[in-house]
Amino acid sequence: VLYYTDHEGKAHEFQLGAYQTNFRTEGAQEFSAVYLGKGTAAEYENVDVKGKLVLVDINQREEWWINFPVYQAHGKGAKALIAVQVGGYGQVDEKALNAQDIAGPPEAAAFSMSFEDSEKLKACLDEKGEITVTLDASSRVMRDVSTYNILGEIPGKRSDRMILLSAHYDSYFSGFQDDNTAVAMMLGIARAFIKMGYQPENTWVFCAMAAEEWGIADSKYDWSTGAYAEVFNVHPEWAGKVIGDFNFELPALSNGNLDGIRCTYEYKDFFEDTLKALPALSPAYPEGVLVSAPIETWSDDFSVAISGIPSMVNEFSAGSFMTTHYHSQYDSDEYYNEAAYRFHHELYGLLLMHLDRQSVAPLNFAEVFEQASASLDVLMCQKSGSRVTALLNLLGQTEEVAEEVYDRIYDINEAGVDSEQCREAENILLKVFKMAQDKFVRLTWEDAVVFPQEAAQNNLRHLKKAIRALKRKTPDAEAAFEALYEIDNNAYAFQF
């Protein structure tokens, strides 16, 4: 809690939000607070912030993540940084507080303040841009602490072949949509099948994941740690046994007339084909369901997929909720959409049953090779002396083989064939899936999923653009710098 007295002698009390950092006052303590715009390096020039609280504005969707201005303040000797959302997140109300993973060291302390409170505080700054405040705070990161993923099963006819359903149970604030409704839906689906006495062909594993929002200190990759630990450390043997993961995020939220499923490339055809054959569901999305690939890094299905388990998630990030209510105290039942929630119960219950009936995991690798081909900058490859024509031919041939394999899988599954040969074939398919994840999946500095050569291609484009700008009759240094900004995270190097 932050306290201060304004110019008229009126006392104010502001509730702050916390990040995963260390800051303990052990009772009320007085500090000087200073406002420094966006908190970039330039705004610290000729300003002494040692031992002070630094107030900054931030837009994490369009500019930079919280760790950049926080570490800048820490490096300048500030006691802590207080971030105010001026765009991007928490835009539902000027009273909104926002929380995100810190993606940095816990020693660089940070808090959040509502826009409304920040405006009141800024109005009381003196001629030096400072104000004396009192802060009573206790924020502590405890290292090497255990948390627990919670598992349950509906035993199938086969115990060695599984389907996973997952949702994370940790949350910021009350977390109604993110992700309590998802855990409830997962349990609701389990309850419905148990009540009807349904025995699946495969064992269904229901996993409430911990530490999705945050779970490891001193790392840029500090989210989805519970899921990562589950599939890499606790149950690495699931890869090769689990034929699919249905991960759920914010399922009681409606993002308009068109719903979405986001999955790995290899399951895109299966979901598209299955959706066409489903019976009419409760009305919620008049434009139907769009299947997209690949999966993204924002949810646990990514951690599950890179372990070798094909995964999907209900599309949850398309609407305005992410900029308004997401990760704020306003994530409550106010945004609850019963029609969407019922629809998702029905949809994923039916998809679960359909996947369960497949004799062989319906993986189609053709989309992977098609997208890999499309991601190649042919002209750039030719100029660099790469054998791009041979590579494209090889990718094309492999795509054709993958289509033939999928057609065979489709026929086997339609016929309901179940044999030892099917098991052997599926074992190979899941190994190929794991290999495809290892060989084809890479991340940009912004954590977008790309093919391995794409980051280098993009950097080369920007380098060439910078060179062209400098080789002009009148060299354009500004244009060259703008091109260099786009290489990796270079833009931040100019800001912090």
Residue ranges and their predicted role:
Residues 1-50:
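Noncatalytic luminal/extracellular "stalk/propeptide" segments of secretory-pathway proteins
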Residues 334-418:
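Charged, amphipathic alpha-helical linkers/stalks
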Residues 1-10, 83, 90-98:
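Protein/peptide-recognition domains central to ubiquitin and immune signaling
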Residues 242, 250-370, 438:
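Active-site-adjacent substrate-binding region
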Residues 422-496:
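C-terminal amphipathic alpha-helical interaction region
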Residues 38-93, 159:
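A conserved hydrophobic secondary-structure block that centers on an alpha-helix together
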Residues 114, 146-170, 175:
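Acidic/His- and Gly-rich active-site-bordering loop/insert found
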Residues 61-62, 66, 72, 146-149, ...:
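Acidic/histidine-rich catalytic neighborhood of metal-dependent amide-processing enzymes
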